[in-house]
């Protein structure tokens, strides 16, 4: 499997990169992610579980039994790739 194929196994699913892009702004709670992205509840929950299992994000305990999602170092390392894809979108779509 090529390196690109391995990356797409983790990030190629619908909403995955958009979740990472949103979390590059800082930790966010589930409801905030859902509101910002407009993703369906089941889809968002599935993608968050997949990205957590892949080590891209983690659940951050907050006060009063609430949690937020935050990027790991592995997730933060995607900043340049996401910026490049965003620039490509501006230039070519």
Identify what each model region corresponds to.
Residues 12, 63-85:
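Basic, amphipathic "hinge/linker" alpha-helix immediately C-terminal to the N-terminal HTH DNA-binding motif
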């Amino acid at each position: 499997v090529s390196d690109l194929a391995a990356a797409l196994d983790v990030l190629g699913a619908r909403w995955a990169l958009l979740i990472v892009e949103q979390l590059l702004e800082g930790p966010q709670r589930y409801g905030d992610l859902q509101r910002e992205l407009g993703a369906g509840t089941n889809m968002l929950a599935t993608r968050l579980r997949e990205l957590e299992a892949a080590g891209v994000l983690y659940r951050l305990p907050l006060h009063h039994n609430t949690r937020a999602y935050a990027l790991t170092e592995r997730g933060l390392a995607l900043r340049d790739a996401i910026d490049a894809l965003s620039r490509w979108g501006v230039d070519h779509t």
